[in-house]
């Protein structure tokens, strides 16, 4: 058990086992953090970083307790991330390379380039496998350390490196359907959409249309309203920020190919995000039911859209977009059915997979990629 005296001595043995919240700053740290130590009455200990976040504390930019302890290495112009097992960078790239008209990242020579924004600064990353690690390279002028490590945190969340999927794999090995998928796609992680506005907007864009056309609309939307970085002879786009869309009109969005209803719903969402009525921070502090009900209050957000966002952004393991057409097609193929399963069929099947619905869905989606 970490004592205040051990905290003062900066004992690193407790790093990752205990997280220290500082009431006066609203920051949580590792016990070994080199920052000035607060007085005893201003310290609160948390067993997990998630509890620290739920307590209203944000990650320290000196010790970065949000990153996996002992699994990241800042090398100046690059950052290396030691990946947890099981993990397959190749499988993740396979999923991310499904559509040739994807506009938010570029994959070439088993490397992925992506532009992100951290604290208002645009950064261009190249991510590649390096032995058992993932290496992040910064292609525009190298940012300072806090930005580099915030970029590493983004990649960890994007590739779901914070999650321990061992329990899912152990469960799947005993299941007649899932065991084939985890063996075939071993190491695949549930690729996320870390930004809440992007996740919900993308889900709204994709409602009731096929994925190929949805990607075309997304590209129109991004290149009309988003920012871009140039490197070499290529442009790298960032998803539009909520503030930019909140300042747009319905007719502006219709011009990129969206329906009037979808345009209205996306602008409403952008206003809610801009004023802070809905945020990722608020939602992840809720349980599944509370977050689900909050999302359903947004115009244009039904069961599928809510669960899609909860699965890919909020990381609820039980999120299940039960009406998803791709999910139904995957189940038809895996179960060798003559026709697609009904909603009740899907619900009955997933009742056997309680607590693993999100990962089961993602692996079934993966099975659709030739």
Describe each model-derived feature in a short phrase.
Residues 1-370:
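HhH-family (HhH-GPD) DNA N-glycosylase catalytic core used in base-excision repair
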